[in-house]
Amino acid sequence: MKSIIIASLVALAIAASPALDRTFSPKSEYVYKFDGLLLSGLPTTFSDASQTLISCRTRLQAVDDRYIHLQLIDIQYSASHIPQSEQWPKIKSLEQRELSDELKELLELPFRAQIRNGLVSEIQFSSEDAEWSKNAKRSILNLFSLRKSAPVDEMSQDQKDMESDKDSLFFNVHEKTMEGDCEVAYTIVQEGEKTIYTKSVNFDKCITRPETAYGLRFGSECKECEKEGQFVKPQTVYTYTFKNEKLQESEVHSIYTLNVNGQEVVKSETRSKVTFVEESKINREIKKVSGPKEEIVYSMENEKLIEQFYQQGDQAEVNPFKAIEMEQKVEQLDEIFRQIQEHEQNTPETVHLIARAVRMFRMCTIEELKKVHTTIYTKAEKKVQLVIETTLAVAGTKNTIQHLIHHFEKKSITPLRAAELLKSVQETLYPSEHIADLLIQLAQSPLSEKYEPLRQSAWLAAGSVVRGFASKTQDLPLIRPASRQTKEKYVRVFMQHFRNADSTYEKVLALKTLGNAGIDLSVYELVQLIQDPRQPLSIRTEAVDALRLLKDVMPRKIQKVLLPVYKNRQNKPELRMAALWRMMHTIPEEPVLAHIVSQMENESNQHVAAFTYNVLRQFSKSTNPCYQQLAVRCSKVLLFTRYQPQEQMLSTYSQLPLFNSEWLSGVQFDFATIFEKNAFLPKEVQASFETVFGGNWNKYFAQVGFSQQNFEQVILKTLEKLSLYGKQSDELRSRRVQSGIQMLQEIVKKMNIRPRVQQTDSQNAHAVFYLRYKEMDYIVLPIDMETIDNVVEKYVRNGEFDIKSLLTFLTNDSKFELHRALFFYEAERRIPTTIGMPLTISGKMPTILSINGKVSIELEKLGARLVLDIVPTVATTHVTEMRFWYPVIEQGVKSLQSARLHTPLRFESTVELKKNTLEITHKFVVPENKKTTVSVHTRPVAFIRVPKNQDSEYVETEEKTISHSQYQMSTEEIDRQYETFGLRINAQGNVLSQWTLPMVLMTEQDFEFTLENKNRPVEFTARVTIGNLEKTDLSEIKFDKIFEKEFDLENNESENRRQYFHKMIREIQSEQGFKNLITLKLEAPQQMYWNTELRTVCDKWIRMCKVEMDARRSPMEHENKEWTLRTELLAARPQMPSSLRQLREQPHREVQLALNAKWGSSKKSEITFNAQLEQSTEQKKFLRNIEREYKGIPEYELLIKAARLNQVNVVSEYKLTPESEYTFSRIFDLIKAYNFWTVSEKRVQNEDRRVVLQLSVEPLSRQYMNMTIQTPEQEVELKNVRIPRVVLPTIARRAMFQQTWEKTGATCKVGQSEVSTFDNVIYRAPLTTCYSLVAKDCSEQPRFAVLAKKINKNSEELLVKVVRREEEIVVKKSDDKFLVKVDEKKVNPTELEQYNIEILGDNLIVIRLPHGEVRFDGYTVKTNMPSVASQNQLCGLCGNNDGERDNEFMTADNYETEDVEEFHRSYLLKNEECEVENDRISEKKNYRNKWNREEKKSDYVSSSDYENNYDEKETENQLFKKTLIKEFSNRVCFSIEPVSECRRGLESEKTSNEKIRFTCMPRHSKNARRFLKEAREQTVADLVDFPVSFVESVKIPTACVAY
């Protein structure tokens, strides 16, 4: 038994022995030759590249089974720019470089490693070794680290079977290599005596990877772009060759490519290999080292020290740049700024020097920065001083910021300049607590208390810096993430700032600072503010906005917080819309979107509902790759909603996405407005610009916004202060106003109306303009009462403008000089490589801007002159770089795109009043002996920099321009010279004939445009003169040949129409006319000119006009004579009917146009147009089908639609030159090609040189167009062309006013028993012989009231009373005529205009209010009000016009009731003149619970609704007419007569059977499709002329009821 146990233990020991996986035999010494290659260039083998070859011999002693000792000897390296090759370069082809003794000693220090299962598990280095040297030695050990077999417990059964075969094997395992702990794929292949092991690293599956990233925190997470849009793609493959179980060769090949739009543009490549040389016994042992145990993974300790120094400054434990002496740094910086000072103009070289200065400043200590200040800054010119300040701010280390703040406090840098410099600090690459604390101290300092711009910039910068280390971003710093205690500390600081704030602006600034910080723990404080109804609305809205940077960190939390805010109708509409806007950017899932859609469908506030619909619709259409999932979800939820917003809603959201899906790149423009009902200013306006480049998403790259609360009060109070020079002295007007006010007060007293006081605090009224850049609030400009008061007090004295102070301010000559260096962006990523060097991939865009100039304003008695002299100079370079760094060498490749602009400018503008003529002159001057230069250069560059042994001397980089040979062949030389206007223009360069962005990055191009003026100054002048209106005779306007045969009407009415038209023209010509002259003269040197005269003659009401335009210009190329243009346009519109009867009986209802144009130089082209704007056959049929007699308001609103002109006929005769004819022909061909699928054409023979065009717009939807064009040779027809919805002109009187109310206003209709409120709520309430208050301004200072009553108990006619502050107006209709009394005095119709009263036709009167108007036809009172009003707190039967449907029934004493009778009684004006009809008022059948009126579907709906509303049965049962549809497989049938249906929300109570006629048509026919679309929205009006297909009995409701 014992023997069995012993044998088992021996077998187990043998199995556990590492001998089978052992690479080296104990007590043996091996010598391997190491070769390492660095290559930087383009991803092509046909271009040069910078290459460095490092070689040495490696002594390796296997001490035992586990440990090996190593030492590097015979180290040498060479570097040059040579062509790329698949083979290793020969060392002789490269330039030999010298390695200093100090660096060689570090590399030759021994090191020790432990190997387990073939893998290097531990490494020990000498205590004297440097970190960079350790990483170099790791790269050699990395070549010996190999797992020869898969771990048994991780092998699959197939792999175990393959293991027995041993010919090949594949397995995956996690393994630590030089580049991190990642998944590695092994392949083992047996080739005779050789065994080849290959392993590749999967960087997508890494547990840890030593890398850093800076400057990426301003981007947003785009999950859809992560895989496809990788900017840097590394690839690493190892190959091990064993022969007879001995390692003969080991090689690793790594490629790092930078990709743009999916194409590789630059690459860096490393190759390393060890080759077996000899094996022997150990003769001279390598010294054993006993340093701390470390891993094989690349050590970022050196990078960590650099990061700590940048972030902590002199407080860091180690200064990694201590080896560079202070004198060396100061000397280099002195040389840099000396060269900048020598450059009078900014060039790309200046930009390069600035980038070097930024890099050098980051290495400096406080003491060294002081030395720079005393030795360089104080002795430099102003330009250099400004550049030094901005480069210190761009450097953004703790030391440079501390140095700047020191000089802020000493005021050697002005506070305004300090505020500007802090904007660059916001973008620092190395944010830290130390920097944040410095900025907070500055914000709380006494200096900042005195200078608000500095304090604001300090707080906003502090918030942005805190985000860099306390929030989750795409940056990958080496320091550990901020602890919870650190986050809580800054949340407390910012919230304490909020709580200590006295003004709204201060609180907003605190929240914007907190928003910039983006700390996840701040969500708890923000939620409390959002949900606290005691907080001002502006604070709650700003708290919602402060959640913006948490959208990627905690999207579900934000949705959980904001969804209840959005759904709670007790919240203000603007807060709810802001919550929705912020919630949508968290990319919600479908269940959340379903909640949003459900709320939208049941929403009582029209602004909220419309804004919600627009947001969902715009997101559903987005092509932004980062919104693709959200777009699909929004499209899905919108499929199931029937909601359609009203057109007049001002709260909206729109976006313009411009993206290329293949490149994952593009831009998007967003625009959003948020309004509320009781404000004429928007509550929020935002315009933003976001970008996606190669999958990198910048959500808020730039955004401007305006937000305000109660700012209308500030404006009104300011206007009161600016009210001019005393009060009116008109005693009569004063008595009338007092009388009107007294009547309004009596109404208030009798009805016990409680004033609707706005619950706003004038002290909290404010507005804020803000600029957001790279997700940071950058600038906040507050405007409040105090700010405006200061301006008013400065320039207004005793109600009058202080002209002298204003003139003194304006006429001061102002010289200015601006120099600003900045980085538009800077980002870098550092990753390890298999050769032991870090690879830094960076992108930056250093820029310098200089503007020198002078501005002056001269004011004269009747004019003013502005002169601006400036010389702007801009230079910028975009650098994309991949760089290897070692103390012994710096190598890499970069792609440079440089641009430069230098242009001296002089601009003069003069405005002058001469002899009743206004003259405006603009003059642009090119100065003499000055040159304008615009240049662009692109080139890829390979570079090598080898420091010399003396560190004090700066070594210039060895650069070589490289290019993609195939792309470079596509370039073409440009060398062109022009001379025009006395200016010499040169354009020369070498540019790509066709290009893409990757091609630009891989080719050398240069282009320079110069404009030089060596003679006297060259002036370009534009002069406009506008003359006064003068009286003239209209007889010169002749309408001779204006009618064409194509204009003839049907039914032989043409002759009658023409006689009527000419009679109308003669009547107009007998009246007084007016003429006006406008001239435009453009003048340039060398007698170049363009002169234009525009002469207009019209009658007083613009019924007939003649417009003449004469233009002349100087001859151009190939012209020997002056070019002229003469045009004459005649236009006449018909009389404007005020009733349907007038419209029907009016013979001429068309607009006539005649245009003659003649142009050319030696040869003239002439064209004549006669056009007629008319009604199409379909529109005329609609007018004929109006059989019922309408009166009053329904008649007029139907007139607006019936009088629309939707068709234009044009007849043109022409005589064109061949060139002009060719141009028109090409345009015609382009139109046909663009509408290819809707075009039909046929060959015809028509009259020569004559074209006939007919264009008609479908009048119902106004979104489809038909067009027919007849030329001499062909007839072209375009059918059903989709166009944007157009507004058709109408000839009805006051039509534009009506359409304006429909689009932007709110309307209330009150009949004898039914009311439709401003907020679209319909209810029944009977009017009596006592006045009921229809609508009233119920503010503390009321301006109007509208009342109505029945004339007597049994009458259907009403009497309306309108009380304005000036007078009381009473109107009633008697014997089809309106009787009007003003202050109890009867007024004749001819005197109505002076009281702002107008009669339209025979049945409608309009009374204008201070804001709005009242329309009355004897039976219905229609009140139109603006949709937004500042002081109009309305009350009455029409509701409060606040946009909410759920709070309409507010009684006179301002409390809400659900009892409609109680609501109605509160607005009854009881007096001795009337008898209250208590029985009628109390009878419940006269009241009905309210319901929401359906949204207006189209302009024609109201027409049928009016017919229904005036039908007694319809009024009783609430029925409406609709076309009935029956659908079959191949046909669709429509009821010829409309069928009654119950309104939405009601159900049929009684029904009857009626026989209905149907007409059927094929489903695929054009009419079927059109009628189906119409029938969904209203009655189809065109079915009478269709044949009857069948008759069927249909059950029709006769009464409806609401349950």
Swiss-Prot record:
- Organ and tissue specificity: Expressed in the intestine of adult hermaphrodites.
Pfam families noted in UniProt: Vit_open_b-sht, Vitellogenin_N, VWD
Q: Which residues are glycosylated?
A: N1266
Task: Identify the residues that the record assigns to the Vitellogenin domain, covering every copy.
Answer: 24-685
Q: What keywords are assigned to this protein?
A: Disulfide bond, Glycoprotein, Secreted, Signal, Storage protein
Which InterPro entries has this protein been placed in? Lipid_transp_b-sht_shell, Lipovitellin_superhlx_dom, Vitellinogen_b-sht_N, Vitellinogen_open_b-sht, Vitellogenin/Apolipophorin, Vitellogenin_N, VWF_type-D
PROSITE patterns hit by this protein: VITELLOGENIN, VWFD
Disulfide linkages recorded for this protein, renumbered to the chain, are C1308-C1438, C1330-C1474
Q: Where in the cell is it found?
A: Secreted
Q: Which GO terms describe its molecular function?
A: lipid transporter activity; nutrient reservoir activity
Record has Glycoprotein as a keyword: yes
One GO CC annotation: extracellular region
What residue stretch is flagged as signal peptide? 1-15
Q: List, for all copies, the residue spans of the domain called VWFD.
A: 1306-1475
**SUPFAM superfamilies in the cross-refs:** Lipovitellin-phosvitin complex, beta-sheet shell regions (SSF56968), Lipovitellin-phosvitin complex, superhelical domain (SSF48431)
Keyword Signal present in the record's keywords: the answer is: yes
Grouped into one coarse class, the protein's main location is secreted
Q: What happens when the gene is disrupted?
A: Simultaneous RNAi-mediated knockdown of vitellogenins vit-1, vit-2, vit-3, vit-4 and vit-5 increases life span, causes accumulation of neutral lipid and an increase in lgg-1 foci in the proximal intestine; however, does not affect fertility or pharyngeal pumping rates. Expression of transcription factors pha-4 and daf-16 are increased.
Purpose of the protein: Precursor of the egg-yolk proteins that are sources of nutrients during embryonic development. Together with other vitellogenins, may play a role in modulating life-span, acting via induction of autophagy and lysosomal lipolysis.
What is the name attached to this protein's record?
Answer: Vitellogenin-3
What organism is this sequence from? Caenorhabditis elegans
* Gene it is expressed from: vit-3
